[in-house]
Amino acid sequence: MQNQQIRIRLKAFDHRLIDQSTQEIVETAKRTGAQVRGPIPLPTRKERFTVLVSPHVNKDARDQYEIRTHKRVLDIVQPTDKTVDALMKLDLAAGVEVQISLG
């Protein structure tokens, strides 16, 4: 595992949840002796929806909704076996999607 690099991508709708999960991952990796690059905030995706409020006429009556998807990237350089084990056992928040890739 010495020449490997672990890239962790996090996605969430709530920025506080993603920051908390990122902090937990960074603390776990540093505690096990790995070097961490990041967290790097990626651009937030804003998805907007416009809904007609009126069931029949009145095109002027509309509501607009927005969903923001926050993203972060972490690189763990030169992870040890302890680092991988600790990351596998880590329990993160339910609203955070985690993608892990080795490279």
From Swiss-Prot:
Claim: Ribonucleoprotein is one of the keywords in the record: yes
Annotated NCBIfam families: PRK00596.1, rpsJ_bact
Recorded GO MF terms: structural constituent of ribosome; tRNA binding
One Gene Ontology CC term in the entry: ribosome
Gene name in the database record: rpsJ
Assigned keywords, A-Z: Ribonucleoprotein, Ribosomal protein
SUPFAM superfamilies referenced in this protein's UniProt entry, alphabetically: Ribosomal protein S10
Record-level GO BP terms: translation
Transmembrane residue ranges: none
Membrane keyword on record: no
UniProt-listed PROSITE patterns: RIBOSOMAL_S10
Residues forming coiled coils: none
Family per record: Belongs to the universal ribosomal protein uS10 family.
Name the record gives this protein: Small ribosomal subunit protein uS10
Pfam families: Ribosomal_S10
Described purpose of this protein according to its UniProt entry: Involved in the binding of tRNA to the ribosomes.
Subunit structure and binding partners: Part of the 30S ribosomal subunit.
Positions of disulphide bridges: none
Domain of life according to the entry: Bacteria
